[in-house]
From Swiss-Prot:
A Pfam family reported for this protein in Swiss-Prot or TrEMBL: ACT_7
Positions of the ACT domain: 72-140, 262-322
Function in brief: Functions as a negative regulator of the TORC1 signaling pathway through the GATOR complex. As part of homodimers or heterodimers with CASTOR1, directly binds and inhibits the GATOR subcomplex GATOR2 and thereby mTORC1. Does not directly bind arginine, but binding of arginine to CASTOR1 disrupts the interaction of CASTOR2-containing heterodimers with GATOR2 which can in turn activate mTORC1 and the TORC1 signaling pathway.
One GO molecular-function entry: identical protein binding
Keyword terms: Cytoplasm
Family in the record: Belongs to the GATS family.
Gene Ontology BP terms: negative regulation of TORC1 signaling
Signal peptide from the UniProt entry: none
Keyword Nucleus: no
Name recorded for this polypeptide: Cytosolic arginine sensor for mTORC1 subunit 2
Record Gene3D superfamilies: VC0802-like (3.30.2130.10)
Description of how the protein assembles with itself and partners: Forms homodimers and heterodimers with CASTOR1. Interacts with the GATOR2 complex which is composed of MIOS, SEC13, SEH1L, WDR24 and WDR59; the interaction is not regulated by arginine.
Compartments it resides in: Cytoplasm, Cytosol
Length: 329
């Protein structure tokens, strides 16, 4: 297995819902007019609380500096696990549960905080740039570590060090944050960038102007329904995470879906905003899923974390996580 350190230097930011009009000029450019910007990594996720933006340095320049833009105090690097060589775009997604033991748990054991972004194509593990020497040292026994430089994949220079580095004891990691599962059913999909103009106005509506208005056809007493939509444009590949009601607004022939048409249910992690310093949150969730061999997507946002699991597994997942939660008492 190879671990690729991508060349994007990323910022993670949050915009309050009511402040999004201040940023739509830049966000529309990043999402729909990529030829007009040098940005290669852009992700926008709307939750009930806010919009989370993950963007590279070039894309960050498209956003106005504003007191309404909260930015995490670090530059982040994206790591990508690739099986059998190639890049994320040409390989099959491995899934967050498959890297739980090899990547997520070892980093948690070393108190290295991670920020996850699963897309239709792959899973990105974001780590603080300043933590990279610890990351490479922790994972060098499991992976061939390669770095992308000017688009070429080269052997990573040995950033490792052993001074003060203690082999951790494997620890039990009970789930310590409150969990909830909205009633929405989600799909994870993509579309050909060439067809983006055909759905651009619809996407703009969904991203900025729908204001969480529920589909009138949806049950009006559905109080467990939340607003969640994620759009990523990374190295020319589009990924979309949306609920079924939103999906039904799109021409079906334009969206890629799995042959099984699989739908996903969400587990939201966190009662209070989680912050960026606590380690092991992703591991607490992904390790029980890995043990049960349940595939998952995982999307961290500025305030909360979100795991998506196959619809038919949701009750078992909630049970397994609740058992883990009980273990903390």
């Amino acid at each position: 297995m190879e671990l690729h350190i991508l060349e994007h230097r990323l910022q993670v930011a949050s915009v309050a819902k009511e402040s999004i009009p201040l940023f739509t000029y830049g966000l529309i450019k990043l999402a729909f007019l990529s030829s007009k910007t040098r940005c290669k990594f852009f992700s926008l996720t709307e939750t009930p609380e806010d919009y989370t933006i993950i963007v590279d340095e070039e894309g960050f320049l498209e956003l106005p500096s504003s007191e309404h833009l909260s930015v995490a105090d670090a530059t982040w690097l994206a790591l990508n696990v690739v099986s059998g060589g190639g890049s994320f775009s040409s390989s099959q997604p491995i899934g967050v549960t498959k890297i739980a033991k090899s990547v997520i748990a070892p980093l948690a054991d070393q108190n290295i905080s991670v920020f996850m972004l699963s897309t239709y194509q792959t899973d990105f593990i974001l780590v603080r740039e300043r933590d990279l020497p610890f990351v490479t040292h922790t994972l060098s026994s499991e992976f061939t570590i390669l770095r992308v430089v000017n688009g070429e994949t080269v052997a990573a220079e040995n950033l490792s060090f052993t001074n003060g580095f203690v082999k951790p004891k494997m620890v039990q990691r009970p789930v310590i944050h409150p969990l909830s599962s909205p009633s929405n059913r989600f799909c994870v999909t993509s579309l050909d960038p060439d067809t983006l103009p055909a759905v651009a106005t619809l996407l703009m509506d969904v991203m900025f102007y729908s204001n969480g208005v529920k589909d009138p056809m949806a049950a009006s007493d559905d109080c467990g329904h939340i607003r969640f939509f994620s759009f990523s444009l990374i190295e020319g590949y589009i990924s979309l995470v949306m609920d079924v009601q939103t999906q039904q607004r799109f021409p079906s022939h334009l969206l890629f879906t799995s042959a099984s048409g699989e739908l996903w249910k969400m587990v939201r992690i966190g009662g209070q905003p989680l912050g960026f310093d606590e380690c092991g949150i992703v591991a607490q969730i992904s390790e029980p899923l890995a043990a049960a061999d349940i595939p998952a997507y995982y999307i961290s946002t500025f305030k909360f974390d979100h795991a998506l699991v196959p619809e038919e597994n949701i009750s078992g997942v909630i049970h397994a996580l609740k058992v883990s939660q009980a273990g903390k008492h």
